[in-house]
UniProtKB/Swiss-Prot annotation:
A carbohydrate binds at D21, G24, N39, N47. Lectin specific for terminal, non-reducing N-acetylgalactosamine (Gal-NAc)-containing carbohydrates including N,N'-diacetyllactosediamine/LDN (GalNAcbeta1-4GlcNAc, LacdiNAc). Specific also for carbohydrates containing N-acetylglucosamine (-GlcNAc) or N-acetyllactosamine (-Galbeta1-4GlcNAc) at the reducing end. Agglutinates human blood group A, AB, B and O erythrocytes with a strong preference for group A. Agglutinates bovine erythrocytes with a very low specificity. Binds carbohydrates bivalently, which is required for its biological activity. Potential for use as natural insecticide. The N-terminus is blocked. Coiled coil: none annotated. It comes from the Eukaryota. Unchanged hemagglutinating activity after 30 minutes incubation at temperatures up to 50 degrees Celsius, then at higher temperatures activity decreases. 14% of the initial activity is retained even after heating at 100 degrees Celsius. GO terms for molecular function: carbohydrate binding; protein homodimerization activity. The modification N-acetylserine is found at S2. InterPro entries: Ricin_B-like_lectins. This is Ricin B-like lectin.
Length: 149
């Protein structure tokens, strides 16, 4: 199963009440990307909706918040375990791979063995890169098309 380019709410599998969220809908460079509860308010919802664009002839994607239009990027391009994800005008490309479970995916940095990881259920926990752990559900994500919300 693969992900179709489009716009999604992306929820962590381990912490099902936490979505990928651009903190405070802040368009400033290096604004933290966090796990946050669903925020269905007119001013805050677009920062939890992510448009996936597939790069031509690849299985690589960019992820961009609907509002504001900031891309997911690894802070300072520091592609190491524990690095924070931030909003940026420049994307860090990712691969989105089925985890073998119905509707569950791992978002990875291509060819590096690092995946987007939500370390805690606490609201506003920064999403970081973590070494891929096939047994860890906090590295798994469910994608819900915004047309289905």
């Amino acid at each position: 199963m693969s992900i179709t380019p489009g716009t999604y709410n992306i929820t962590n599998v381990a912490y099902t009440n936490r979505l990928i969220d651009l903190t405070g809908s802040n368009p400033a460079e290096n604004t933290l990307i966090i796990g946050h509860h669903l925020n269905k308010t007119p001013s805050g919802y677009g920062n939890q909706q992510w448009t996936l664009v597939q790069l031509p002839h690849t299985t690589i994607y960019t992820m961009q918040a609907v509002n504001p239009q900031s891309y997911v990027r690894v802070r300072d391009d520091n592609l190491v375990d524990g690095a924070a994800l931030v909003g940026s005008q420049q994307p860090t490309p990712v691969s989105i791979e089925s985890a073998g479970n119905s509707g569950q995916f791992r978002i990875k940095i291509p060819n590096l063995g690092l995946a987007l990881t939500l370390p805690s259920d606490a609201n506003s926990t920064p999403i970081v890169l973590g070494e891929v752990d096939e047994t860890s559900t906090n590295q798994l994500w469910a994608f819900e098309s915004v047309s289905a919300v």
